[in-house]
Amino acid sequence: KRQEYASHFYEAYHAWNNYSADPKNINKTQEFSLGWLEDFKRRKEQGITDEVTVDATGKYVYYGNEDYYDALYKKTTFAQDHNLSVTGNNGKLNYYVSGRFYGYDGLFRYNTDNYKMMNLRAKGSVQVFDWLKIENNMDFSNMDYHNPINVGEGGSIWRNISDEGHPTSPIFNPDGSLTFSAAYSVGDFIYGKNGIDTNNKVLKNTTGFTASFLENKLHVRGDFTFRNTDEGQTQRRVPVPYSTHEGQTVELSAKYNDLKESNMRTEYIATNLYADYEDTFGDAHYFKGMVGYNYEQSTYKSTYVQRNGLLLDDSENINLALGDAITCLLYTS
């Protein structure tokens, strides 16, 4: 099928240009000529299966039969979901604890999109006295996600495969280096350096009480809640090495060589305190009254730091970048 792709590309390009122009490249990453197309046909007829040759200048010439989506996706993947709960009650004390872990090993064959989620909930109450009950409800979650990215100009992996994942261009050169077409697309994932790592944590807790007085006619209730939400991201972008000539290495998107760290924190607190009184007088008159107080506050803080000039392609700490830094701080309440 590889030679048919090259022929169809030529026919489509030639027709689009009113049969007056021949292509010089397949988009930007593979050279094209009528001589190359004829050579491709000849190699097919002669049963030559080598996908890469080297011309007199040392440049690689490709006659590939590559399936870029086969290289992009795994044949199989694995996900796991575990749940556990414990409950108990002895009359004065009751509790419920549950936990969940979900893990997904990702869909991509290289630099895969791992996802992990952990949830924990614990709630309970205790009847301290006949007139006083205390309750607590805690919820915690932690999420980790790795999102691989492309530094090629197209942005997404699917767009870049559409633009540059030519079946006639293999992914690897004979020396194991990436081809130009691969570097623009799935080769970025194979290199495995570019991506966004996200970690989100949420901790919420509510503590409350209920008190009864005057033969259960007066009730006082109160609670205090806090919720801390932490959102963190680390993005790394580095150039992708590839080769078009034997023994020579160049870099795609050399302008990208940076690390960005983003941290956002939201702190929320709320408290409620109210009392109600109800009574029936003389079997004919009913009275009920309520008074209460509420307070809420939310504070948001964010820090954004980006710095270029990474010492190593796999640096994970902003301190391992020696270039220019951009810092942004935000605070709202």
What are these model-derived regions, one by one?
Residues 1, 79-81, 94:
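A beta-strand signature from Gram-negative outer-membrane beta-barrel systems
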Residues 211, 217, 226-228:
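N-terminal hydrophobic signal/anchor transmembrane helix of membrane proteins
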Residues 88-90, 126-127, 209-213, 277-279:
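Residue-level signature of outer-membrane beta-barrel architecture
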